[in-house]
């Protein structure tokens, strides 16, 4: 009877994943987009960040409550204190046609304390090219902004019963086509774990609740202000007509390119980073199945008053995720996310465990509005792949 239920559930999970993939493809083919303008001036609000792999790559917002592998840094910094194993993990993430990112993470426990560190570097798909003589580059607004840089994260968490409190400290540097920033920020999180209506025997709890606020900090512009970048914007149709880079002022915000001179601030300018607020719930009713829910929104303390608190509602995104363990050594995961702008995100992943070794792979598809510089409208699906492995380092 149990085998029949598991097989039926497997078939239904497969059907659900197919439906999610079909839905994202349909959205990409039919959604209408608004004309897209340059995004460089918004980078001052964005902390230096690099994607990671692990379970976070496939569960995304639905991982806030769970936060139980070496990718917990993004989801909830309190996760390190409640993990049942320490981990040393490496992840490689590729954004097709966009970037590569490498991550080395460590997490461990000592008594009721959890701690960890993560080092990451990211670079455009074209390669490292960290030449100090690199000139500013202008690209069409519909293309990804080429970024390279690195970030370091230190984590500490404390467990009191089933409740843990944790924090990350982060510092990084980013070069985005000639526009350079450093950022310093912190994350704080809370996680409660316990057993509720548990029908199986396991060392891990079956109920998780998580809250977190990430990227509380600031960026500092470290590149010089560019007054005249006409020669830089050779590929920008708007700049060729000299309607923005006219030698008298920097690019206007309506320019249809991503050019470093769109940030008109002077060197040394400080700006608050966008803060992400997260809440999540996860429950494992059976030993072989877990489902999770998550909600996220973003705000910027520097612009919140002028943009009105309605932005908290407008930036809301909702996630649902599931993990299915068909065998004791294999876990499959999937998630679906949608926000108020109807942008969608679908993720799937697999994790294999062999003794003290974990191997994982995750795939994510983002469907968002884009347009070309000519004003054409449509929607674009961006694809990301993560591969990684971890060594389990003893039991908490």
From Swiss-Prot:
One Pfam family cited in the UniProt record for this chain: UPF0164
Coiled coil (residue ranges): none
Database matches in InterPro entries: UPF0164
Keyword terms of this UniProt record: Signal
Entries under Gene3D superfamilies matching the protein: Outer membrane protein transport protein (OMPP1/FadL/TodX) (2.40.160.60)
Domain of life: Bacteria
Keyword Mitochondrion: no
Signal sequence extent: 1-28
Protein family per UniProt: Belongs to the UPF0164 family.
Record protein name field: UPF0164 protein TP_0858
Species assigned in the record: Treponema pallidum (strain Nichols)
